[in-house]
Amino acid sequence: FLPMLAGLAASMVPKFVCLITKKC
């Protein structure tokens, strides 16, 4: 469960950073 959650977070964070900072 934790590895999957960590993988999901790792894939989601860059997307949020990209959207928020507008730096892709």
Curated annotation (Swiss-Prot):
It holds the Pfam family Antimicrobial_1. Its main location: secreted. Antibacterial activity against Gram-positive bacterium S.aureus and Gram-negative bacterium E.coli. One of its GO terms (biological process) is defense response to bacterium. It is found in: Secreted. This is Brevinin-1Lb. One of its GO terms (cellular component) is extracellular region. Expressed by the skin glands. Belongs to the frog skin active peptide (FSAP) family. Brevinin subfamily.
